[in-house]
Design a protein with these regions (language model features):
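Cofactor-pocket helix-loop regions in the catalytic cores of large enzyme subunits
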Residues: 1-48, 53-56, 92
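Thiamine diphosphate
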Residues: 38, 42-238
């Protein structure tokens, strides 16, 4: 069972659509996973103070709470929060806080069906960790390779007081962003069914992430050999 259809929206496309929907007075907030790296490359701030990013410590769950703070500090702006499903599950209850405080903001929840960023990093290091996908445990193999978990993010967000929209294609997301902007006095959540495969090309710089020196896995051994070759090219400018 595939995690998503190829026709579903992608994270880069979603960033583009949120940028276009933001307008001249909007701002965006984000915190963890692959989103900050993609937004660093793709987001185009319209005005000063319209880009709020926590990335140094990758604080999963900070997105919605931080967005509420921005919206309370600058009520004249329409705040957009972009968050993956993994981070959303860490602190989704802050939607209730936004409802309690009467804060209007748009939360764009990208449903990747798992922790995509750490899965990609794990794959690059030679590891195979199916527990990064939101799948059920297969009783025959004992691994998380069973059916995709039927997590109903739309129902969850609605139960916490949000007005909810859903989208699975770029056209649907464009419409949902427009409708969400009209919601005031309460949070609006757009649940976007996302194809996690399309990504944004990396920079030419190399990221020094050590790989295990000792492993029985041929994939890890190959990743370690590649790491050691790249390490020889590393230069310190400090």
């Amino acid at each position: 069972q595939p995690l998503a259809a190829e026709t579903h929206d992608s994270q880069p496309a979603a960033i583009r659509l949120v940028t276009e929907a933001r307008g001249d007075d909007g701002s965006v907030g984000c915190a963890a996973g692959g989103l900050p790296g993609d937004m660093h490359k793709l987001w185009r701030p319209a005005t000063r103070g319209s880009y709020h990013m926590e990335y140094g410590n990758s604080t999963m769950g900070d997105e919605i709470a931080g967005g509420i703070g921005v919206a309370m500090a600058e009520p004249e702006r329409r705040v957009h929060v972009m968050v993956g499903d993994g981070s959303y599950l860490m602190l989704a209850n802050e939607i209730m806080t936004a409802r309690q405080e009467g804060v209007g903001l748009t939360i764009v929840l990208l449903d990747h069906h798992g922790y995509r960023c750490i899965r990609n990093l794990s794959d690059a290091c030679g590891a195979v960790n199916p527990f990064n996908d939101f799948r059920a445990r297969d009783p025959e193999t004992g691994t998380f390779t069973g059916e995709v978990l039927p997590i109903d993010f739309a129902a969850n967000a609605a139960s916490l007081g949000a007005e909810v929209f859903t989208a699975g294609t770029p056209a649907e997301l464009e419409t949902a962003l427009r409708d969400a902007r009209a919601v005031t006095g309460r949070p609006a959540v757009i649940v976007v069914e996302t194809n996690p495969e399309p990504g944004v090309p990396a920079y030419d710089a190399w990221w020094d992430v050590p790989v295990a020196e000792v492993s029985v896995s041929e994939r890890v051994q190959a990743a370690r050999a590649e790491y050691e070759e790249n390490l020889k090219k590393e230069r310190s400018f400090v």
